Amino acid sequence: SYPGGTVKNYFFNTVTYAAVNGSQNIGGYNYVFENCMLVRGDLVTRANGNLWYMWAGSWATQTWHTIDGNKYYFRSSYDAAKGIYGMNIGGVNVEYVFSDEGVWLENFTGIYKSGSYSFWVENGIKNKYPGLVYFEGYYYYFKYNDGNILGPMVKNCTFYTDKTNGLMKAAQYQFDEQGRMIN
């Protein structure tokens, strides 16, 4: 937050010097003002398919914005984050999960596939080491790491489950190709 509260953005007509209100096209970008205050910028799809957000005359960077009820994070490259995107929050790396359209999946809890890996996600945040999880009638195990990948699901193997979260005793269990415990 800023000293004195939240920053409010206004735009003044260059001819009348009056604050603008409603829908406005300024510099080729579409904005919405309510009570003369900027409430929505212009979400722009670039030629490469990436989303950028024009807010108060500048591209949004390293910041969150709520647009039409959806939350987006705009990276330092100006692109909306997609897939799993990590940010350092108070010295802790937090990995958020975004849709292919860049919307934070804040209400998603379940198994999220990324490339050849599957991860456990809680409220749109990847859990780095959930261990044993019971989900939709099956047990799944997410191990600590696979090289530099944290928290991947165990699939198609027998694996010693040491972090059971009190669901069963630590032991070797077999998992199928979908990651479901089968014995």
Question: Which residues are covered by each model-predicted region?
Answer:
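Extracellular adhesion/carbohydrate-binding repeat motifs centered on closely spaced tryptophans
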Residues: 1-183
